[in-house]
Amino acid sequence: MYELGDDVRQIDWNVYARTEKVYIKRYLDEREIKVHIYLDCSNSMLIENRKWKRAKELAGALSFLALSNDDWISLHCMGVHHQKCFMKKGSRDAKAILHDIQELSLDRTGEDGISFFEQVGKGVRKKSSVSFILSDGLESLSLIEEALRKLSIRREMVYFIQLLDEEELTPSYQGDVKLLDSEKHKETNVSISPSMVELYQERLLYHNKEIEALCNKWGFGYTQTSCLPPLNEIFFKDLKENGWIR
């Protein structure tokens, strides 16, 4: 949020056009930035190994960039009963955080899931310069809205990266199948037709658009990606073109 004395040349006019609120552009390469990264470790992120692998890659790349610029990062692994938090500072910790993320193992077979966004909303932490949310966003909009609202109170810049697997975007299932609720471990027998897939995609699109609208409401950044694009394309094309990094 703009404060008296800030450089008016750094006002983000794109955000102002959407929200009529004046925010100052923040970049990861400004000095002494404090970065919070909220990594969704709930069961839905682990169903497809591709999605969990890509989420860790994104968390590692963001952490490495911040630490290489001699900044602070706090990586919060949420959506689990026993939360983990890695706090690092400066380039000396850049390799260590990559090792920590690589070693994250979350085998929770048979364990009921808990809400990632509920934990984000309940967390009371010191204000940071920038916060990143890495999540599939597959939770109720009310929980997502409440978490984002609480983050907005701290008047920091928040970037939401919604990561979905291709199978979630374009399901390949047809006919009689057994579906498993990844959070509650309940099975349901269904007959999947093309019209059902189309209805699912319409509802998913609506859900994702609502998340984007919530981000716009508070002047937060939002982007959606999948596991298919190369990591460098997501990182240096999507994020850079959005002005999140430079």
Q: Where in the sequence are the language-model features?
A:
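Short amphipathic beta-strand/extended segments with alternating polar/hydrophobic composition
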Residues: C85-S91, T188-I192
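Short, electropositive alpha-helical surface patch
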Residues: K88-D100, K217-W218, K240
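A generic local structural motif
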Residues: V22-I24, F117-V120, E145-E146
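Von Willebrand factor
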Residues: D93-S129, L141-S142, L164-D165
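Von Willebrand factor type A / integrin I
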Residues: G121-S129, L141, E146-R246
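An amphipathic, basic-hydrophobic helix/alpha-beta surface used to engage anionic
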Residues: M1-K88, F132-L134, K150, G219
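A short, compositionally biased
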Residues: W72-I73, L98, S172-G175
